[in-house]
Amino acid sequence: LLHEAITQSLAGRIALTTLLPFSFEELRTSNHSSKATAHDYLPMQYEHILWSGTYPRVIAHGVPANEWLPNYIATYIERDVRQIQAITDLAQFTLFVRMCAGRTGQIINLSAMANECGISPNTAKAWISLLEASYIIFKVPPYHQNFNKRLIKAPKLYFYDTGLACSLLGIQSPEQVQSHFARGALFETMIATDIKKWFIHRGKQANISFWRDSNG
């Protein structure tokens, strides 16, 4: 709502900039990460960056991820969500967000998500759009030579920050990432997100897609 009010009142007189959690490129070229860089994390210590994520508060200010991220989630749900959309059952919405974290890197199945959360498919669709509008998640469409089929086929869901996804999944340490069922999906999320950041930081549209053959 605030975004809409600003763009309507200052149309033609503003420039919008998307600020996302740090990319690997930023970690390498800045002094924000005094303890470690992306080169230090990958490939041997990538579980650590999967778990901590790259929000500035965690990376630049050294606030422990397991302290800051749960507070960020609570603030987002209790304050920001109320301002953006009139959601009456915040507990149910919280469950839905956690469910999305368990599906990062997977194809979106609105019917299944709605059934598991006890909501309608239309509500699930609206909540996905809300998470997307507030830069919690983004969607990646499947690649197909026929453009119309790209619009029809279901996209994949990715979190902008793997640390946020880990916090929602209840992962308490980098060591737990190593044996967690979502480890592969979190790694895929980290790569997909960094590709998207590469485009956004250069003022380009991130027209990325995923490939899936007949064998899945």
Where are these regions (language model features)?
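Accessory nucleic acid-recognition modules appended to NTPase machines
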Residues: I59-G216
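Short catalytic/ligand-binding loop motif for oxyanion handling, primarily in non-cytosolic enzymes
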Residues: L2-H3, L168
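Interdomain motor-coupling "hinge/lid" segment immediately C-terminal to the ATP-binding subdomain
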Residues: H3-I107
